[in-house]
């Protein structure tokens, strides 16, 4: 690796850290509870879904609270990143106009910021494991980084597409909101994948978000790395990132005039 490439990678990393840190400070400025909100939101939804599906509808899934949060927490990372990415270039319009830097770092910093929030939820998962008489597995040490990197690649691919196209098609945010809500129910977060009738199994087979959620759930609940799901996550992520960067590189020269 050349000295120039090392410098470039170091510069990109420093830039990513600076922008992520800025976004965190802006988000939690004057906030009393700070990072706790990143845990409270999915936990509240988990409590609501537990009441509806376990107590009212009596869904027969063992350790249902743990089952829920191991799906909801990584989903929250993805959904928040995808939704916030729509406005990532718009929110940083002044920086983009006045400073020369790789603009693709902006949606990536958003993904990383939400990833930090996800890491804050892992102690909650550990606490519920102990509640249900279970223990974290040693495989978490390498499993969490492997799946997390895959989710970063996948989510960045989605985010760079959304953040770029939303500058030119502002109706996109409406479609994204509906799409994320639809995909939430098409992904086995509230229910087990084996509860889906055979004729609808394609919903799981062709849904990379299902592979993402099931990868985390297998790791957290069973200590297992499901390489089939992880491979789907990585392959889809690389494809989305390549497509996203192609769209970004084609349209980035018009950012200043749009913003």
Swiss-Prot record:
GO terms of molecular function: ABC-type transporter activity
Transmembrane segments: 33-53, 73-95, 111-131, 142-162, 176-196, 228-248
Keywords attached to this entry: Cell inner membrane, Cell membrane, Membrane, Polysaccharide transport, Sugar transport, Transmembrane, Transmembrane helix, Transport
InterPro entries assigned: ABC2_TM, ABC2_TM_bact-type
GO BP term, example: polysaccharide transport
The organism's place on the tree of life at top rank: Bacteria
Topology versus the membrane: Multi-pass membrane protein
Predominant location category: membrane
Subcellular location: Cell inner membrane
ABC transmembrane type-2 domain sequence ranges: 33-251
Coiled-coil features, chain-numbered ranges: none
Any one GO cellular component localisation term in the record: plasma membrane
PANTHER family: INNER MEMBRANE TRANSPORT PERMEASE, TRANSPORT PERMEASE PROTEIN
Family, per entry: Belongs to the ABC-2 integral membrane protein family.
Function, as annotated: May form an ATP-driven O-antigen export apparatus, in association with RfbB.
Protein name per UniProt: O-antigen export system permease protein RfbA
Species, as recorded: Klebsiella pneumoniae
Organism phylogeny: Bacteria, Pseudomonadati, Pseudomonadota, Gammaproteobacteria, Enterobacterales
């Amino acid at each position: 690796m050349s000295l120039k490439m090392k410098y470039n990678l170091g510069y990109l990393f420093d830039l990513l850290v600076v922008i992520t840190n800025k976004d965190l400070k802006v988000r939690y400025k004057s906030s009393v509870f700070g990072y706790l909100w990143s845990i409270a939101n999915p936990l509240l939804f988990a409590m609501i879904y537990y009441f509806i599906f376990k107590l009212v509808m009596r869904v027969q899934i063992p350790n249902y609270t743990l089952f829920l949060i191991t799906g909801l927490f990584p989903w929250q990372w993805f959904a928040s990143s995808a939704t916030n990415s729509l406005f990532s270039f718009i929110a940083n319009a002044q920086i983009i106009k006045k400073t020369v830097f790789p603009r693709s770092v902006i949606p990536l910093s958003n993904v990383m910021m939400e990833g930090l929030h996800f890491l804050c939820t892992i102690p909650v998962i550990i606490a519920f494991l102990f509640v249900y008489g279970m223990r974290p597995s040693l495989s978490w040490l390498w499993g969490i980084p492997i799946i997390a990197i895959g989710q970063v690649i996948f989510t960045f691919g989605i985010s760079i597409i959304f953040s770029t196209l939303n500058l030119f098609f502002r109706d996109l945010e409406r479609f994204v909101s509906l799409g994320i809500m639809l995909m939430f129910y098409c992904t086995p977060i509230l229910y087990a994948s084996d509860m889906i009738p055979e004729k609808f199994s394609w919903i799981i087979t062709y849904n990379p978000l299902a592979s993402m959620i099931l990868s985390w759930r297998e790791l957290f609940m069973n200590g297992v790395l499901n390489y089939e799901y992880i491979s789907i996550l990585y392959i889809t992520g690389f494809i989305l990132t390549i497509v996203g960067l192609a769209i970004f590189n084609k349209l980035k020269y018009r950012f200043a005039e749009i913003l």
